[in-house]
Amino acid sequence: MANESNNLGLEITELRLGLPGDIVVSGESISGKKRASPEVEIDLKCEPAKKSQVVGWPPVCSYRRKNSLERTKSSYVKVSVDGAAFLRKIDLEMYKCYQDLASALQILFGCYINFDDTLKESECVPIYEDKDGDWMLAGDVPWEMFLGSCKRLRIMKRSCNRG
């Protein structure tokens, strides 16, 4: 009977352990070893597969949202001067007090600014727009409160506001 099954060509449908496509000659015996013998040298010089980046990853919307949140932490405000055709953006966090800001604006725009209201000798008056949209005189509130509420800074010439 065993001879008859060999002659029928049932080797194709025979179930056996091993990799698909391995041809086992009927005369060979299958060893029960789990690992290859030390005599067999496996020389695989294949490079590991490179990780392909998925198209559209990271999502652009979340990337922009994350970066825009980081930018809002800095306190850049627009500064305009009456009579000047240009605006400048400055970071208020760079300055420690009103006097530091006044000296920087004096260098930037070339007009003498004093945030102290008692001295009337300055040629320019700085005002700012707060979060509510109201225009306030700069220097009237403490510096920390000014940093938190200033959205825009405007420097008005004294000759223009006397009317």
UniProtKB/Swiss-Prot annotation:
Residues 74-160 form the PB1 domain. One of its GO terms (biological process) is auxin-activated signaling pathway. GO terms for molecular function: DNA-binding transcription factor activity. It is found in: Nucleus. Transmembrane segments: none annotated. The keyword Coiled coil does not apply. Pfam families: AUX_IAA (PF02309). A motif (EAR-like (transcriptional repression)) lies at residues 15-19. PROSITE patterns: PB1. Keywords: Auxin signaling pathway, Nucleus, Repressor, Transcription, Transcription regulation. InterPro entries: AUX/IAA_dom (IPR033389), AUX_IAA (IPR003311), PB1-like (IPR053793). SUPFAM superfamilies: CAD & PB1 domains. Induction: By auxin. Highly expressed in stems and flowers. GO terms for cellular component: nucleus. PANTHER family: AUXIN-RESPONSIVE PROTEIN IAA17 (PTHR31734), AUXIN-RESPONSIVE PROTEIN IAA5 (PTHR31734:SF87). Belongs to the Aux/IAA family. Homodimers and heterodimers. The N-terminal half of the protein contains two conserved domains I and II. Domain I includes a slightly degenerated ERF-associated amphiphilic repression (EAR) motif which seems to be involved in the activity of transcriptional repression. Domain II is required for the correct degradation of the protein through the SCF-mediated ubiquitin-proteasome pathway. Interactions between Aux/IAA proteins and auxin response factors (ARFs) occur through their C-terminal dimerization domains III and IV. This is Auxin-responsive protein IAA5. The gene is IAA5.
